[in-house]
A protein has these predicted regions:
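Short, acidic, Ser/Thr-enriched surface-loop or helix-capping motifs
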Residues: 2
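Charged alpha-helix within mobile-element recombinases
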Residues: 92, 109-122
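Catalytic-loop motifs flanking and including active-site residues across diverse enzymes
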Residues: 19-22, 84, 88, 114
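A short, flexible helix-boundary coil/loop motif
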Residues: 57, 93-107, 123-143
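Active-site beta-loop-alpha junctions of metal-dependent nucleic acid enzymes
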Residues: 11-32, 39
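Helix-centered, glycine/charged polyanion-binding patches within enzymatic domains
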Residues: 35-108
Length: 143
């Protein structure tokens, strides 16, 4: 997502596929959505030399993630950033009922997940358009 929580790219993946592999596939497919010099915020699960090399060398982006205990401090405490990222997930799960999608087939899950992401994007876009102070707030649309 963008800083305001606008969905940029997404996919559904088998739960046994690692986060780094999924993110690599998304970025290879949607490489035109990132620009050299951009920062990607992620959690500790994205630690890995090969993945970070892909981001830096192939895409020219910088990965910022919490430091693992076995590595030197690089970016300091990122608790506020983590809270900010989790707030986007909370919006999807809470207000948009992402976890109670009701899809019974892979196609149904895909369609209903897409509906929720589109609803979030429409709300953020509308808030941008009207100049709302908080772009990700969906309270005005929560009927």
């Amino acid at each position: 997502t963008t800083a305001e929580g606008m969905p940029v790219s997404w996919c559904l993946a088998h739960p046994k596929v690692g986060e780094r592999e999924v993110m690599t596939a998304l970025l290879e497919r949607d490489h035109h959505l990132v620009r050299s010099g951009q920062v990607i915020l992620a959690d500790k699960g994205f630690a890995g030399r090969e993945f970070e090399a892909f981001l830096t060398e192939r895409l020219g982006v910088h990965l910022v993630r919490p430091d693992r205990k076995d590595e030197p401090a690089r970016h300091g405490r990122l608790a506020r950033v983590r809270q900010w990222i989790e707030a986007v997930f909370d919006t999807l799960k809470g207000q948009l009922s992402l976890e109670q999608h009701g899809g019974r087939t892979p196609a149904g899950v895909f369609a209903r997940t897409g509906q929720r992401l589109l609803a979030l994007a429409a709300g953020i876009w509308h808030n941008w358009t009207i100049g709302a102070k908080i772009k990700r707030s969906l309270i005005a649309y929560d009927h």
